[in-house]
Amino acid sequence: MDRVKLTGVVLRAVDYGESDRVVTLLTAERGKVSAFARGARASRRRFGGALEPFTLLSAEVRERSGSDLLGLDSVSVVRGFGALRGDLGRIACAGYAAELARELVRDHQPHDELFDLLVAYLGALDAAPPRPAALRAFELGALRAAGLMPRLDACARCGAPVGEGPVRFDAGEGGALCGGCAPGVPRTLPLAAGTLAALLRLQEGGLAAAASEPLAAPAGREAREALTAFLEHHLGRRLAARRFLDEIGPLLGG
């Protein structure tokens, strides 16, 4: 069968049988794909350490008859992001970003925007300790790529301007709520004016804006809670990596 080359980030690697491994990649060419790496555990000569999560690699794959899994024939590391692997906070944030990317997209649907965003965020983690603003920017960018962006520039229910004061946020309604709509929605979350402004800057400027956005408490907590609720609403659950971030503490980037 014809072989093709893909460039992708390892989102997950799962041991299979005694010697094999199944890897899930977010690729530039085909979106999310899974590939069967025969003998990956038995010998490191063929794949080396290239199949570790968060590795950016170039892979040669082929279709496998009767299987949704591609066959992984050879790989080479494009970028290993070695610096982030020595720090628990960076690993936790990278794991969360990888799991979020995996859950937001379907198989074999190209997502150039999300691929570029994930590579950029892993690069940021490789270069410096995790910043809460960068993780919020990644979440917002991933939601945009998936077509699920929360409404922050106006009321998600009626479309009216939300003004410059504090607002409420509701995941089910789709974002921020004005003073007229919020009382009719139970269990909304607070967003101070400064928190909303910071989220709007991150929504507009992405990871580049995160470099100059402190997002300190309590704004950091409000932003985290709002986006976590929004993601849980659309995914139907809290991601395992999100729970781990909660356990090790928001100061590590969560």
UniProtKB/Swiss-Prot annotation:
The leader peptide range reads none
Q: Which HAMAP family match?
A: RecO
Cellular component aspect of the GO annotation: bacterial nucleoid
Q: Which family does it belong to?
A: Belongs to the RecO family.
- Function, as annotated: Involved in DNA repair and RecF pathway recombination.
Give me the disulphide-bonded residues: none
Alphabetically ordered keywords of this record = DNA damage, DNA recombination, DNA repair
Protein name, per record: DNA repair protein RecO
The cross-references to Pfam families, in alphabetical order and at most eight, read: RecO_C, RecO_N
What biological-process GO terms show up in the record?
DNA recombination; double-strand break repair
Q: Which SUPFAM superfamilies match?
A: ArfGap/RecO-like zinc finger (SSF57863), Nucleic acid-binding proteins (SSF50249)
